Amino acid sequence: MPRRKKSETTNEGTTVVVDEKLEVDNSIGPTLYQRDENGLLKNVQYIFNDDGSVNWRAMIKEEHLFPNKGWFESRGKDCPKSTEGLEDHQLLIKLGGIKELAKLRGFSSVCYETVKCEKDHVAVSCAINFSPNYETNAEPILFEDMANATFNNTSSFATKFLETIACNRAFVRAVRNFLNVHIVGDDEIDKSNASNMTTEQSISVGPTSILK
């Protein structure tokens, strides 16, 4: 059991240090963080579609969403300061929001495989073992998706971390595609500058068609 140091002053005016036992109760977390027979967290209120499936899009907190500045700029429009009234294709979701969705859904493992690794082009696949729930007839589901990061679709700073960018993009894509979330991840979009593009064109599997 952990101990806390406690100072006491005696009648003689000297100070002694006494070990004091701390009462520790770690039962609160495990008690709250449990899943029911349907595979849903007991301490979370889920939102459902008309067919009874979980509306994972509705489970995303507003703090994880922000306007897609590039979408508005490409159309000569001012980017709004809030997400109010915006459609899903006008939004981006932060990596933290995707991680929270994955946590709410439940998973047992995440596995990355490097498909291609070159100086200017890294492609990675991400396979996630999603935990059983009532939506999958109590069966675990393995879902896999992939993404790439190149000099042509990352910022000048991010070109130093192509492997990390590719892994994040693949993870984001796997989670949101499995959960049927059509908001593009902030990590997925092309953040390159025209001046930083290489002359050699790379094949991109980015969500360009979704952003249009």
Each language-model region and where it sits:
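Polyanion-binding surfaces on beta-sheet-dominated domains and ring/shell assemblies
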Residues: 2-212
